[in-house]
Amino acid sequence: MQRRIMGIETEFGVTCTFHGHRRLSPDEVARYLFRRVVSWGRSSNVFLRNGARLYLDVGSHPEYATAECDNLVQLVTHDRAGEWVLEDLLVDAEQRLADEGIGGDIYLFKNNTDSAGNSYGCHENYLIVRAGEFSRISDVLLPFLVTRQLICGAGKVLQTPKAATFCLSQRAEHIWEGVSSATTRSRPIINTRDEPHADAEKYRRLHVIVGDSNMCETTTMLKVGTAALMLEMVETGVPFRDFSLDNPIRAIREVSHDITGRRPVRLAGGRQASALDIQREYYTRAFEHLQTREPNVQFEQVVDLWGRQLDAIESQDFAKVDTEIDWVIKRKLFQRYQDRDNMELTDPKIAQLDLAYHDIKRGRGVFDLLQRKGLAARVTTDEDIADAVNHPPQTTRARLRGEFISAAQAAGRDFTVDWVHLKLNDQAQRTVLCKDPFRAVDERVKRLIASM
């Protein structure tokens, strides 16, 4: 499948600092965030004009699921649009607090752990064909995903009673299974719950829940681009060495704690390989695969960065990637503060900086400040993100959903939508079922809109 439907779901951490004596719980702060949404959508679970889904997930975490995208830059742009949508709700909620005499600053973090040790996720979705053995995909993908944090981890300072350690991944400590149908109880690497949101006879949806939430656009593009390439190679029968892991859950933690990538990981059957070895094998296959498939500039950029990051890890000289990979950017930032102020990783200021890196509010968040200074690379523009806040991708089913929602809202009509259904809640209860996520034009939807 050379054209693939992809999407990213991001849960955001919420906290609030209050100016007066009145205090609100995280649940109450989250409800303030969603008041404007509930006022027009009559629910805290809505679809937006840009085709995305916005809702309040378990544990008071706002969640934004991008619309269906079919290329990498489009997906990164719509992922960033989610940050802007949430930031807009943040500003509105702070004004509501002020109007009610509850002064406070709300913070939304695009990260994966809070100070209490709770974890929330960034889930990737990839459409795959129903035909073929799912176990073949999961067998190849598990070692890839366990070691992928080398190239696209968000970075984290892990505080223990004895010391502090810089880790590659925020999510690695919170994963407890390899492949499972659960998402919250056991937190697997790959979720097997079969909800394709498409024609179930043709497709299924690969749901990856092991990844970190990335701030840097190039890291997000690398994360989804390498996974999409891996799927494409598995589907076309590219042979891979067997890197089946003896214990994926132990391995994912071991990899996260080793920024050299050289620590041996135990494979099934008693063999060993380093995370760097495993990633290098996948990179080499991807590089060769690009020579045989039709040209794709975005995949070429992904494979180029993949190779440069592996070279940087091998040499431990990160100068050529220190604006493109989240954990490298963050580690460099920490080292600068440590050198300047002679502080240890255990210093509370480092923990504060670690959190502030993920603050999505422009002009306040540390990552945004780095990006404005040119210290974090981009693949989108602010103009494209602003457009994605208001308009769906034009090449997928999301276009139909977005146009239907816009028309229904403009006409003041009562409607219901989900990923596959568009419904007018009138006497006729007219519904259009959109089972093909690749289809951006549909006469049935045009007629439904024209009837409003």
UniProtKB/Swiss-Prot annotation:
EC number: 6.3.1.19
GO molecular function list: ATP binding; ligase activity, forming carbon-nitrogen bonds; magnesium ion binding; ubiquitin-like protein transferase activity
Residues reported to bind Mg(2+): E9, Y55, E63
Function recorded in the entry: Catalyzes the covalent attachment of the prokaryotic ubiquitin-like protein modifier Pup to the proteasomal substrate proteins, thereby targeting them for proteasomal degradation. This tagging system is termed pupylation. The ligation reaction involves the side-chain carboxylate of the C-terminal glutamate of Pup and the side-chain amino group of a substrate lysine.
Species in which this protein is naturally found: Mycobacterium leprae (strain TN)
Name of the protein in its database record: Pup--protein ligase
HAMAP family, per database record: Pup_ligase
InterPro entries: Pup_ligase, Pup_ligase/deamidase
Keywords from the UniProt entry: ATP-binding, Ligase, Magnesium, Metal-binding, Nucleotide-binding, Ubl conjugation pathway
Metabolic or biological pathway: Protein degradation; proteasomal Pup-dependent pathway; Protein modification; protein pupylation
Note: The reaction mechanism probably proceeds via the activation of Pup by phosphorylation of its C-terminal glutamate, which is then subject to nucleophilic attack by the substrate lysine, resulting in an isopeptide bond and the release of phosphate as a good leaving group.
Superkingdom of source: Bacteria
Key word Metal-binding present: yes
Family, similarity comment: Belongs to the Pup ligase/Pup deamidase family. Pup-conjugating enzyme subfamily.
Active site (UniProt): D57 (proton acceptor)
Catalytic activities: ATP + [prokaryotic ubiquitin-like protein]-L-glutamate + [protein]-L-lysine = ADP + phosphate + N(6)-([prokaryotic ubiquitin-like protein]-gamma-L-glutamyl)-[protein]-L-lysine
